[in-house]
Swiss-Prot record:
Family the UniProt entry places it in: Belongs to the venom Kunitz-type family. Sea anemone type 2 potassium channel toxin subfamily.
Positions of disulphide bridges: 19-69, 28-52, 44-65
CC terms in the record's Gene Ontology section: extracellular space; nematocyst
Record's keyword terms, sorted: Disulfide bond, Ion channel impairing toxin, Nematocyst, Potassium channel impairing toxin, Protease inhibitor, Secreted, Serine protease inhibitor, Signal, Toxin, Voltage-gated potassium channel impairing toxin
Protein name: U-actitoxin-Avd3s
Residue span(s) of the pro-peptide: 74-80
Domain of life: Eukaryota
Upper taxonomic lineage: Eukaryota, Metazoa, Cnidaria, Anthozoa, Hexacorallia
Keyword Secreted part of the UniProt annotation: yes
Localization annotation: Secreted; Nematocyst
Amino acid sequence: FLLCFFLVADVSYGINKDCLLPMDVGRCRARHPRYYYNSSSKRCEMFNYGGCRGNANNFITKKECEKVCGVRSRDSPKEN
């Protein structure tokens, strides 16, 4: 039990809780390009939002997703 707790805590520490929600296209049938934080790949990825419902892991731009979810862009210099 403790090992599982620490593994989950390590992955999610410091990340906005909304960013840990699963991608949710919503119930409507529109196709609005949006971005969500994929906690498996640790990147913001595009998806087609249906236009209603869904959840808070839904960003209009990739830049907004990266800012809110703390994702470093590939162009950022790495810390030593």
